[in-house]
Amino acid sequence: PEEMNGDSILIQNFIYNDPECLADKKASIDKTPELVELFSDLFILYPFHKEKYGHCLTKLGGGMEHQTMSTMGGFGFWLVAHELGHMWFGDNVTCATWSDIWINEGFASYSEYLALQYLDSQSAANSMMNGVQNYVMSEPGGSV
């Protein structure tokens, strides 16, 4: 990010000690710096830039962000964007109560959309948004 004046942010990944694991995950892991830079440009500088950001691979599904380190079941583009988005909305800015958790999740989901819009295409972002809308609207009696 421009505000770093040529400095960098440490991105640290903990994966299984298996050469096949690295070969399988490397392309996805390598997208992380681009996402950090994008969100730093769109929001504010990565809030924990003086420390680091990273991932810890686990056999559990999905992901869970923790300040500066996300536990990940994989490195899918949407998942990485979502958990990274929580660094700004969830870890840097937190909710007053658990009933406000939708704010954190909403911004993290919006981060997925922004990542697609800027790093893939507007068409991909629109497709994601349509898919989410169709899913929500298909749930009888579900919350919106």
Model-flagged regions — what are they?
Residues D7, N13-V144:
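Hydrophobic alpha-helical and helix-loop surface patches within well-folded domains
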Residues P1-G6:
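Structured beta-strand-rich cores of soluble
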